[in-house]
C-alpha cells in the first residue's frame, strides 16, 4: 500500500510540474484581485515617502517597466523609437554567440542609428555614435557595445515623458500592483503541497504550487519545536537573512528564495525548485567525472560563489550534496543555513562539513572571510574527480583525523591530472590564505583567469549556454521515495511547548523578494489580471455616470488624501461599513457609494488618534468629545500605515492651529455633520 501511495504521489507531482511549465496561469486556483484605482491617492504618498517614485526605481522594476513601456508605445509618439531601441539592445545583450552579436549589432545600427543620422534626427551624442562605429569597424561586438546608448535613452525618458507617465492611468495601475505586492500575507492556504523531496535537521522540503499564479516551488518547512529543542533559533533566522541577501539580482547558480512566512508551528522558505538531484547522488550513480565534466560544474559554482561574495556572504558548506541540478542539468548552490555575512565583522566559528572545511575555519578563534569557500571549492572539485575528499583517505570517518590531515598534509595530486588542473587545485588547496588562489585581492576574478579555465566564455556560462555533461532523466522524480526519506519521530518534541516569547522571535520572519514576485507574476497571470481589471473598471465607470465619481470630490480642493476605508458602524458598533473618505486639514469627510449625504468629523471634535486592535486587525481609533469613539479599518497594510500617519499629522497640526486661534472658534459642535452631496465633475480614472 505504501508503494502505491508513493507512486501516486510521484505521478501527481510530475503532472503538476508538466502543467506548470506549459501553462502556469491555467493552474492558478486563486485570482489576484487589484484594488480600485482610487488606491493611487494613498499609494502615491506611501511610495513617495520611501523614495520609490523615481524614474530609476520604476523603470528597473519588471512591472514598472512593462507599464511605462505600454504608456510610451500607446500614448507618447516621440518615446516609441527610444523604447524599441532599448528593448533591441537588451535582447542583443542576451546573445552568447559572437557571430549572432555581429549580425544583430549591424541590424540595430542600421535601424536605429544610421537611419536617424541620414535624416539628421539622431537625438543621441556624438560620443555614443563614435563608440559604436569604432567597435563595429573592428568587429568588437561585446555584450556592452551599446551601453552608452542605454544611459542616454534612460536620460531622454526620465524628464517630461516620465512626468506624463506619472499623471496617467498606467501609473495608477502601477500603484494597484504595488499595493498587492506590499500586502502579501502568505499562509499554507496559498500553496498546494505535493510530495516530500528532502529532509534536514530541522524539517522537510516539499514540492509545491503557488495557488494564485500556478508556479512550482520548493517549500522548506522547519519545525519550530525541533528548532527550540536543538536551540537552533539563531541558525534558522540566519538562513532567512542570508537568503534575503543573495536572492536579489539575477543569479541562476544559487537556489534563491522568493518568500518566507511562518505558521504557529513552522518556518517556511519558498525556494527555487530543483528537480535534477544533487551532485553527491549523481556521483554515486554516474561515477567520477572527467576534467571536462568537472570544469562545467566548477564554472557555474564559481559564478554562484561570486554572487555571494559580492554581497559579503561566505557560504561555508560547499560540498557535492549541496549542489543541486535543475531539469536541464545546470547547477545551483543550495542550503544557506551555515552562510555568514562578513561585511561588518569576520566570522571565526568552526562550522561546515569535515573534509571540506578550510584550515582557518578549523583553527578556532581565527577570523576568516570568503577565503574559506575557495579552499572548500578545491576539496569539492577533487571529490568530483576522485570520489572522495582529498583529506579523507581510505573512507575514514574519524573527524579528528580528517581535520588533522586538513591542517598538516600536503595533498598529492595524481599524475593523471593535467598540469592546468594540478595548478588550479594546488592554488585552491593552499593552507596559507595569503598564497591561496582567490585570496590575493581579486576574488573570483583570480580563479576565473586561471589557465584551467582558458577558453571559457564566462558570459556564455552566465547565460547557461554550455551543454551540461549530465541531463537528469525526464519523467522521474530525482529524489528518494517518501518512505526512504523518512519522517521525524514526533515523540522527540512531545514535551516542547512554544511560548509567546518563542513566537516573538519570528515576528519579522515574513518576507517577499519584490523582484522575484514581480518576475513570477509577469511570467504567469499579469496580462490576464490586467485584462480582467480593465473590464471591471470599465463597468464601474459606466455605472458611476449615474452615481458620480467618488474621487472627483477631492479635485480642486485642499484634500490631503482620499480612498476607501471600513468604518465600524450601526448603533452597537458591530458591523464594518465600507465608505469613501476624504481627509482635509480641518476635517474628515465620508460617504457611501451612491449616498446623497456627506458626513463630517472636524478636527476640533477629536481628542486623540490612536492605534488599536479588533480581532487581530489593526485599526485607527478616534476618541471624540462627549465620550464617543470612531473606529476605522484599512483594507491593506500600506493603506493603514499611510492613513494612520496622515490622520495623526493632520490632527496634531489642527490642534496647534486651534490653540493659536481665537476662543470663539472653540464653541461646541455636534459629533458628526451631514452635508449635502456636492456637485461632481467627471474625470479620468487616475485616482486623483
UniProtKB/Swiss-Prot annotation:
Entry keyword set: ATP-binding, Cell projection, Kinase, Nucleotide-binding, Serine/threonine-protein kinase, Synapse, Transferase, Ubl conjugation
Residues covered by the Protein kinase domain: 191-453
InterPro entries listed in its UniProt record: AGC-kinase_C (IPR000961), GPCR_kinase (IPR000239), Kinase-like_dom_sf (IPR011009), PH-like_dom_sf (IPR011993), PH_domain (IPR001849), Prot_kinase_dom (IPR000719), Protein_kinase_ATP_BS (IPR017441), RGS (IPR016137)
Subcellular location: Postsynapse; Presynapse
Domain PH, first and last residues per copy: 558-652
Chain sites annotated for binding ATP: 197-205, 220
Outcome of substituting residue 104 to K: In a lung bronchoalveolar carcinoma sample; somatic mutation
GO annotation, cellular component aspect: cell projection; cytosol; plasma membrane; postsynapse; presynapse
EC class: transferase
Domain AGC-kinase C-terminal: 454-521
One Gene Ontology term from the biological process aspect of the record: desensitization of G protein-coupled receptor signaling pathway
RGS domain segment(s): 54-175
Entry annotation: catalytic residues: 317 (proton acceptor)
Record field: catalytic activity: [beta-adrenergic receptor] + ATP = [beta-adrenergic receptor]-phosphate + ADP + H(+)
Residue ranges, annotated region (Disordered): 669-688
Region listing for N-terminal, in residue ranges: 1-190
Keyword Protein transport found: no
Entry coiled-coil feature ranges: none
CDD domains, A to Z: PH_GRK2_subgroup (cd01240), RGS_GRK2_GRK3 (cd08747), STKc_GRK3 (cd05633)
Gene3D superfamilies: Phosphorylase Kinase, domain 1, Pleckstrin-homology domain (PH domain)/Phosphotyrosine-binding domain (PTB), Regulator of G-protein Signalling 4, domain 2, Transferase(Phosphotransferase) domain 1
Post-translational events: Ubiquitinated.
Function in brief: Specifically phosphorylates the agonist-occupied form of the beta-adrenergic and closely related receptors.
Assembly mode: Interacts with GIT1.
Protein name in UniProt: G protein-coupled receptor kinase 3
Amino acid at each position: 500500500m505504501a508503494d502505491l501511495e508513493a507512486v501516486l504521489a510521484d505521478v501527481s507531482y510530475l503532472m503538476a510540474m508538466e502543467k506548470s511549465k506549459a501553462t502556469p496561469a491555467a493552474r492558478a486556483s486563486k485570482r489576484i484581485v487589484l484594488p480600485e484605482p482610487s488606491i493611487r491617492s494613498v499609494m502615491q504618498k506611501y511610495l513617495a515617502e520611501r523614495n520609490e517614485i523615481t524614474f530609476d526605481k520604476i523603470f528597473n522594476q519588471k512591472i514598472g517597466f512593462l507599464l511605462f513601456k505600454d504608456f510610451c508605445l500607446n500614448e507618447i509618439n516621440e518615446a516609441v523609437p527610444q523604447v524599441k531601441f532599448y528593448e533591441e539592445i537588451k535582447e542583443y545583450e542576451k546573445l552568447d554567440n559572437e557571430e549572432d552579436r555581429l549580425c544583430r549589432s549591424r541590424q540595430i545600427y542600421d535601424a536605429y542609428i544610421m537611419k536617424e543620422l541620414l535624416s539628421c534626427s539622431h537625438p543621441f551624442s556624438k560620443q555614443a555614435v563614435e563608440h559604436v562605429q569604432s567597435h563595429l569597424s573592428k568587429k568588437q561586438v561585446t555584450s556592452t557595445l551599446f551601453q552608452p546608448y542605454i544611459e542616454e535613452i534612460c536620460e531622454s525618458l526620465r524628464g517630461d515623458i516620465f512626468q506624463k507617465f506619472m499623471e496617467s492611468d498606467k501609473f495608477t495601475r502601477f500603484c494597484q500592483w504595488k499595493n498587492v505586492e506590499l500586502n502579501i500575507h502568505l499562509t499554507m492556504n496559498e500553496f498546494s503541497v505535493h510530495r516530500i523531496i528532502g529532509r534536514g535537521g530541522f524539517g522537510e522540503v516539499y514540492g509545491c504550487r503557488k495557488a494564485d499564479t500556478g508556479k512550482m516551488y520548493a517549500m522548506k518547512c522547519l519545525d519550530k519545536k525541533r528548532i527550540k529543542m536543538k536551540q537552533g533559533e539563531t541558525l534558522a533566522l540566519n538562513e532567512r537573512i542570508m537568503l534575503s541577501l543573495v536572492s536579489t539580482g539575477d543569479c541562476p547558480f544559487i537556489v534563491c528564495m522568493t518568500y518566507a512566512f511562518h505558521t504557529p508551528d513552522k518556518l517556511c522558505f519558498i525556494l527555487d525548485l530543483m528537480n535534477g538531484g544533487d551532485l553527491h547522488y549523481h556521483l554515486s550513480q554516474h561515477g567520477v567525472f572527467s576534467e571536462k565534466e568537472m570544469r562545467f560544474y566548477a564554472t557555474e559554482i564559481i559564478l554562484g560563489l561570486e554572487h555571494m561574495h559580492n554581497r559579503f556572504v561566505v557560504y561555508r558548506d560547499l560540498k557535492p550534496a549541496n549542489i543541486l541540478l535543475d531539469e536541464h542539468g545546470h547547477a545551483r548552490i543550495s542550503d544557506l543555513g551555515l552562510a555568514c555575512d562578513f561585511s561588518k565583522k569576520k566570522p571565526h566559528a568552526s562550522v561546515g562539513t569535515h573534509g571540506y572545511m578550510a584550515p582557518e575555519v578549523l583553527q578556532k578563534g581565527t577570523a576568516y572571510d570568503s577565503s574559506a569557500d575557495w579552499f572548500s571549492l578545491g576539496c569539492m572539485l577533487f571529490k568530483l574527480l576522485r570520489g572522495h575528499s582529498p583529506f579523507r583517505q581510505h573512507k575514514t570517518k574519524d573527524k579528528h583525523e580528517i581535520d588533522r590531515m586538513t591542517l598538516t598534509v600536503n595533498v598529492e595530486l595524481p599524475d593523471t591530472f593535467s598540469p592546468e588542473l594540478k595548478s588550479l587545485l594546488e592554488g585552491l588547496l593552499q593552507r596559507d590564505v595569503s598564497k591561496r588562489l582567490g585570496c590575493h585581492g581579486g576574488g573570483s576574478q583570480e580563479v576565473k583567469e586561471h589557465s584551467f579555465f582558458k577558453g571559457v566564455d564566462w558570459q556564455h556560462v552566465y547565460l547557461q549556454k554550455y551543454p551540461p555533461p549530465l541531463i537528469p532523466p525526464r519523467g522521474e522524480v530525482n529524489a528518494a521515495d517518501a518512505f526512504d526519506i523518512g519522517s521525524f519521530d514526533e515523540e522527540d518534541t512531545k514535551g516542547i511547548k512554544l511560548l509567546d516569547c518563542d513566537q516573538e522571535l519570528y515576528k519579522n520572519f515574513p518576507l517577499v523578494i519584490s523582484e522575484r514576485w514581480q518576475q513570477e507574476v509577469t511570467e504567469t497571470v499579469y496580462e490576464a489580471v490586467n485584462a480582467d481589471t480593465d473590464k471591471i473598471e470599465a463597468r464601474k465607470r459606466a455605472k458611476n455616470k449615474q452615481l458620480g465619481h467618488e474621487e472627483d470630490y477631492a479635485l480642486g480642493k485642499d484634500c490631503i488624501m482620499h480612498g476607501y476605508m471600513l468604518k465600524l458602524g450601526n448603533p452597537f458598533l458591530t458591523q464594518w461599513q465600507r465608505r469613501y473618505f476624504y481627509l482635509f486639514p480641518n476635517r474628515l469627510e465620508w460617504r457611501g457609494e451612491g449616498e446623497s449625504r456627506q458626513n463630517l468629523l472636524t478636527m476640533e471634535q477629536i481628542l486623540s488618534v490612536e492605534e488599536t486592535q479588533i480581532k487581530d486587525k489593526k485599526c485607527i481609533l478616534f476618541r471624540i468629545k462627549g465620550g464617543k469613539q470612531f473606529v476605522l479599518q484599512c483594507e491593506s497594510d500600506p493603506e493603514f500605515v499611510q492613513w494612520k500617519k496622515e490622520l495623526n499629522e493632520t490632527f496634531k497640526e489642527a490642534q496647534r492651529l486651534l490653540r493659536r486661534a481665537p476662543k470663539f472658534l472653540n464653541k461646541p459642535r455636534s459629533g458628526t455633520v451631514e452635508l449635502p452631496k456636492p456637485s461632481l465633475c467627471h474625470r479620468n480614472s487616475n485616482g486623483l
